[in-house]
Amino acid sequence: MIYHVRHRTILRYASPMRLARFNLRLRPAPWPGQWTSDYALEVDPLPSAIDSRPGAWPVHVARLVIESPIRQLTIESRFRIGVQGGAIVPQADDPTIGAVAQAALAERDMGPAAPAHYLYASVRAPLLAEIGAWVGDGLSPDRPIVAAALDLAQRIRAEFRYEPGSTDAATPVADAFAARHGVCQDFAHVMVVALRLAGLPAAYVSGYLRTYPPPGKPRLIGADAMHAWVMLWCGRTRGWIGFDPTNGVITGDGHLFVAMGRDYADVAPMDGLFVGGGGQSLQLMVDVVPEEEMAGGA
């Protein structure tokens, strides 16, 4: 599948923002089975400086410096992206959780996507005993890894309520777990913690999800959003496989990978520091459109 993605952010400030340093993680990092072309980043007003480079993880970071007073900042990211590969399903010969946990410890690779980076607790994904108790025997060492991880994703989908606005980017995973509700970010953190408690390399992924309008209704421009899911290293043969606990599925060609890190903090679409500005408001418009649905095609 080929998609055209537009991500537009408008920040408005109650009083002039005098100085800012922002990090943007909107450009898809290279990832197997996916390609990106025609990337464009527009910032209005133009920043004093902009620097773009790969990050420490599979993430691309654009750093903006703003040194003139402004009351509104508009950022638009656009690109064309192709997602390849067939559906992934559990196999009878998948390695067990115990075998993968041992293999991860033996890996010597220390590149951005090396499993070693994703084995341990991180700032937004502490290894909470209560999550381990909840999982119980669901991730026992003798279970085939892909089937067990899919069961976990489906359990989160069944037992946690998706409730937009009930949490935000700062909500601790412990709070979302205790409340049994939240959004994709919370569910991804819960699954990451559960998998790491079992000794498995689990990463947090930021990306986009293809959505469908209601039957008979037109696609609403700007109504899509970013999404979060989990990447699990399933051994050298299987490699990294995506699991979406919000929807209880293994990821497919409707999941568009942007960035991967230890938790949300590594891949946040935008963060930084600013001076002045007073109160602020955020307007976000996202479109993920299959190329075949665009007038005239590519």
What spans do the regions from the language model cover?
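Structural beta-strand/beta-sheet cores of well-ordered domains, especially the beta-sheet scaffolds
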Residues: M1, H7, A20-F22, Y39, ...
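Intrinsically disordered, low-complexity N-terminal segments that are enriched in acidic
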Residues: M1-A106
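Ser/Thr-centric signal marking residues that sit
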Residues: T9, T167, T246
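Glycine-rich, flexible loop/turn motifs
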Residues: Y13, A158, D168-A169, V173, ...
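Glycine-rich, small/acidic residue-mixed loop/short-helix segments
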Residues: R25-Q34, Y39-L41, N247-S281, V288-P290, ...
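Secondary-structure boundary elements
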Residues: T96-G182, A198, R262-Y264, G279, ...
